[in-house]
Amino acid sequence: MQRDQIALPFQWPVADRDEDFLVSDANRDAFTHFTRWSLWPVMATLLTGPRKSGRSLLAQIFVRKTNGRVLDHVEDRDEEELFHAWNDAQARRRPLVMIGDRPPPAWKIRLPDLASRLAATPQVAIDEPDDELIAQLIVKLLADRGIAAPPDLPEFLVPRIERSYVAIQHVVDTLDRDILANRKRMSLAAARHALQEAGLIRRAQRRA
């Protein structure tokens, strides 16, 4: 008897093009903030938002255009490192993008000079995804893996999955594995079955 084939995940290319960052009301303020960087009071900004929200992608697109620098996970970095990076950005006139889960004072800063510089630094946040962005991301992330989403799939999933970027990623990963394992074209029925088995969808809920 032939053993069931194990679906092995492929390493998909990392998105880094302008069109890879999808804009909706959930992230429009952040997107606009970076297009108007010449108006920043200092050559630095703090970008916060949930993990998997595209915050690193937006920052990388920006620094590629401006010859800037990105520092991710700033809450966990040495304060002296942040202090010198901020000063260096001003001296070189190269914008610094600091990325974190939350803005200060949610993470305690002991170095007074760093605290004063961050207080003068503009901050912008990406919110949890809205319905429009959830639908766009499902279609795009599946397309990035060579999978055509059925036209009715986004509308079905939007009210049934958790409203978070991590949940969207789990949904796409699950559908990708199901397609690889079963070697068949995706349908709404097959997607619903795979996601129900994984515990990723619930009864449709009315969005506020």
Which sequence ranges carry the predicted segments?
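Dynamic helix-loop-helix/coil hinge segments at AAA+ ATPase domain boundaries and subdomain interfaces
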Residues: I6-R28
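Pre-Walker A adenine-sensing motif
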Residues: N27-L39
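Walker A/P-loop nucleotide-binding motif
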Residues: V42-L58
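Conserved P-loop NTPase "ATPase switch" module shared by AAA+ and STAND
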Residues: K65-E81, A85-D88, R92-P103
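Short regulatory helix/loop adjacent to the ATP-binding pocket of P-loop NTPases
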Residues: P104-A119
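Conserved AAA+ ATPase "SRH/arginine-finger" region at the nucleotide-binding site
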Residues: T121-L133
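C-terminal helical "lid" of AAA+/P-loop NTPase domains
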Residues: E155-P159, V166-L180
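Conserved C-terminal helix/linker of AAA+ ATPases
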Residues: I179-E197
